[in-house]
Structure formats: structure tokens, C-alpha cells
From Swiss-Prot:
Belongs to the MEMO1 family. It comes from Aeropyrum pernix (strain ATCC 700893 / DSM 11879 / JCM 9820 / NBRC 100138 / K1). This is MEMO1 family protein APE_1771. SUPFAM superfamilies: LigB-like (SSF53213). It comes from the Archaea.
Length: 281
């Protein structure tokens, strides 16, 4: 059995179970977070098609990510979470799937859904099994403890990281995800993670972030890429963002911003900041 051990415990988030739970709960109760703890184990509401959370260290983006997971907690528990993020390392394939085994965090193990992953590979024509793209990547790893806090180990994952940020890849993955749900009846939610603009002064960074969030809410994946290109927005995950938007379009659902902040709002350091979204689709 393949095991992916945590690569960023102790850096992006605490390395011990006790401290990690405290950090997650602090994210929920933080002034920039939802302000309350989530319902654990799943709720009775309608689950979203997709979410777009950030993926920085918990001390920076944890409170904004918590808005996503609070909202998720109100809906019925998914059996499968398709995790989609940007590949920051440059290793691996254009779209890399970790296809079997388990992922570990300080909160325990989560099983990879091999059959759902196989279907995404088949349907997308671009996603392929590849461990190398995942070994040191943080964008998906930081989502797992939040999911484990909600559901324990009672869900499976399909982890995909995208190296080539293109509209075509976004559309292919979104359509594969749509078929997974609609043709195969898989009770799944897509968690497509990206940070927003990077490393500009507070006001300029915020201006670019709000332009991108407006494009996301339009519900058109092409508008996401056009806005990023037209305004030189350095979001790290255009493909995950656009895939979530396209998944919503296919299901007849428009994105809705749950929360937004940047690192300057958290730390008070505004010389250069990074933007963090929380979006429900």
C-alpha cells in the first residue's frame, strides 16, 4: 500500500494532534473566520458542488479557509472529496493523480478512492497517475486536517495537482468530475484550492483580488483566465479556480464568495501581501 506522509506538518500547520486541533479550532473562532465551530459529521443541508479555499500556512489563511469548511459542515457529508490544487514544485506531470493508498496527517489516515480516480483519468484524458507531483506539494495537504476535523476518516479522497495552468485542463477536469457525480452517482464535492494575487502592496493586491473574485462570481471559466491575464494577477491556481467554476456551470450553479482577506489583514504587515479566497460553488 502506498502511503503519503505529511511533508509540511510543523511548518504550514502544527505537527502534533493536540496543537493541530487547537489551530483548526482557532481558525474557526478567529475574528476573520466564521466565529464559531462547525457541525462535525455532516449536516442536513444541500452540499455544494465545489469550494475554493486558500492554502497558505494556517496562521495566515486558516481563518479564511475555515469559512469553506464551516459552510461544508452544514451540508450532507460527502463520500468522496476530489482535491484539486496547483503544483508549486514543478515536479511530475501536467495533471498528477495520487491513485491509491492513504494520505497521513497528525490527525490520522485518509483513504484514496482508486476507482473514482480511475474514472477521472478515463474521463479527463489529461489527468494521469503520478506520485512525483505530490511528494513535496502543500496545497492539498493543508486541506486534509480541516476535512478530518469535520469527518474523521469517514471519507475518501481523489488528490490531483495541476502543473500546467490552462483553460483546457480546467474544462477537462471539471467535466470528468461532473460525469463522476452524474453518471456514476458518486456523492462527491470538489475542493479546488488557490491563493489569489501575490506579493504586491495591500491596496493594489486587494484591487486585483476583487477583480478576480468578481470574475469567479460570473460563473464563466474563460472569464477567470481572461481577467488573470488582462490584469497580471498572480493567482497560483487558475486551473483549479476555473475547474470549480466550470463544475458549477455544468450543474447550473453560480459561485458565491463566502469570505475574503489577505495576509495584511491577518498580520498587519501591508507592504506586500497575498490574497485568500473562500468561495462556494
Amino acid at each position: 500500500m502506498k502511503i503519503r506522509n505529511p511533508a509540511h506538518a510543523g511548518t504550514f500547520y502544527p505537527a502534533t494532534r493536540e496543537e493541530l486541533v487547537k489551530s483548526i479550532e482557532s481558525s474557526f473562532t478567529h475574528p476573520l473566520g466564521p466565529g464559531r465551530l462547525p457541525q462535525r459529521g455532516g449536516g442536513s443541508g444541500e452540499q455544494a458542488i465545489a469550494y475554493i479555499p486558500p492554502h497558505a500556512g494556517y496562521m495566515y489563511s486558516g481563518p479564511i479557509a475555515a469559512h469553506v469548511y464551516y459552510d461544508m459542515s452544514l451540508g450532507r457529508k460527502p463520500d468522496v472529496v476530489v482535491l484539486l490544487g496547483p503544483n508549486h514544485t514543478g515536479l511530475g506531470l501536467a495533471a498528477s493523480l495520487w491513485d491509491e493508498g492513504v494520505w497521513r496527517t497528525p490527525l490520522g489516515e485518509v483513504e484514496v478512492d482508486s476507482e473514482a480516480g480511475r474514472l477521472v483519468v478515463e474521463y479527463s484524458g489529461i489527468v494521469a497517475p503520478d506520485d512525483e507531483g505530490h511528494i513535496y506539494e502543500h496545497s492539498l495537504e493543508v486541506q486534509l486536517p480541516f476535512l478530518q476535523y469535520l469527518y474523521g476518516g469517514d471519507f475518501r479522497i481523489v488528490p490531483i495537482v495541476v502543473l500546467h495552468q490552462t483553460l483546457d485542463i480546467s474544462i477537462r477536469i471539471a467535466r470528468a468530475y461532473h460525469r463522476l457525480r452524474e453518471e456514476n452517482g458518486v456523492n462527491a464535492v470538489l475542493v479546488a484550492t488557490s491563493d489569489l494575487n501575490h506579493y504586491e502592496p495591500y491596496e493594489e493586491n486587494k484591487r486585483k483580488d476583487l477583480l478576480l473574485l468578481k470574475a469567479i462570481e460570473e460563473g464563466d471559466p474563460e472569464a477567470v483566465f481572461k481577467t488573470i491575464e488582462a490584469h497580471a494577477i498572480s493567482a497560483c491556481g487558475p486551473s483549479p479556480i476555473a475547474a470549480a467554476v466550470e463544475a458549477g456551470r455544468l450543474a447550473g450553479v453560480k459561485p458565491r464568495v463566502l469570505a475574503y482577506a489577505n495576509s495584511g489583514d491577518v498580520t498587519g504587515e501591508k507592504a506586500w501581501v497575498v490574497g485568500y479566497p473562500a468561495v462556494r460553488v
